[in-house]
A protein has these predicted regions:
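Short, Lys/Arg-enriched N-terminal segments with co-localized hydrophobic residues
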Residues: 4-21
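Catalytic and substrate-binding clefts that recognize carbohydrates or anionic sugar/phosphate headgroups
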Residues: 22-25, 68-70, 91-93, 111-218
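A low-complexity, Ser/Thr/Gly/Pro-enriched, surface-exposed linker/loop concept
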Residues: 24-64, 70-119
Length: 218
């Protein structure tokens, strides 16, 4: 998932092996010359406020006080709008005023459990769990339902990208997709219903087949 700052647009890219390389890297490992990446490298700290969990993820392993100098950080918020659903928000520079787009969300007040051990933090709503890895240099979040892992984010998956040539900034997330696992739907578009291998742009007001607003976006 790629979001450009202040544009209100998300690009959902579904492909095995990390297609986001086409926008920010040459191949899988080499970062394009004009891109400055900030990857979530490890868990640093957290705050619990009622049913909200805030996790701080610096851009590199913090072994000493000096490692915290001139270093960016991603702030990850976990909340639950309804039972069995976990909402994850990734932010950078939270002091900037949010200018929208604003969408009203009908939220409930589910029972949320937050448990912490030396190696992980578990955020649970109903049967759905987000498990945050606390081990040094081992950033990752696993999303599970019961005993089944649904997806995960890990090494170089969550990032904040800056294009130095254009001055544009992007928030990026890559979620694990297993072999023979498919993504369906994503709105009224004249493309195959199975969206694997496609790039799908999502707007709050996305053109439908006969109106300005697509009513089938999921």
């Amino acid at each position: 998932l790629v979001s450009e700052d202040d544009s209100g647009k998300w690009s959902i890219i579904i492909e095995e092996g990390g297609m986001i390389a086409m926008k920010f890297t040459n191949g899988y490992w080499q970062v394009r010359e004009e891109i400055t990446p900030l990857y979530a490298a490890e868990y640093a700290d957290c705050r619990i406020n009622g049913s909200e969990l805030t996790v701080y993820a610096p851009g590199k392993h913090i072994a000493s006080r000096g490692d915290g100098l001139n270093l960016g950080m991603l702030t990850v918020h976990l909340t639950s709008p309804m039972e069995d659903v976990i909402k994850v928000s990734v932010r950078h520079f939270e002091g900037v005023q949010y200018r929208g787009p604003f969408v009203e969300v009908a939220e409930e007040n589910p029972n949320v459990r937050i448990e912490e051990t030396e190696e992980e933090i578990v955020y649970q709503s109903g049967k759905t769990r987000a498990v945050i890895d606390k081990r040094p240099g081992s950033w990752g979040i696993r999303f599970c339902n019961g005993d089944r892992e649904l997806t995960s984010t890990g090494f170089r998956n969550m990032a904040y990208m800056t294009n130095r040539d254009t001055g544009r900034h992007y928030t990026v997330e890559q979620l694990a997709l297993d072999v023979d696992e498919y993504v369906y739907g994503l709105g009224e578009r004249f493309t195959p219903f199975v969206k694997n291998g496609q790039t799908v742009e999502m707007w709050n007001e996305d053109g439908g087949t006969a109106s300005e607003i697509a009513y089938k976006n999921i």
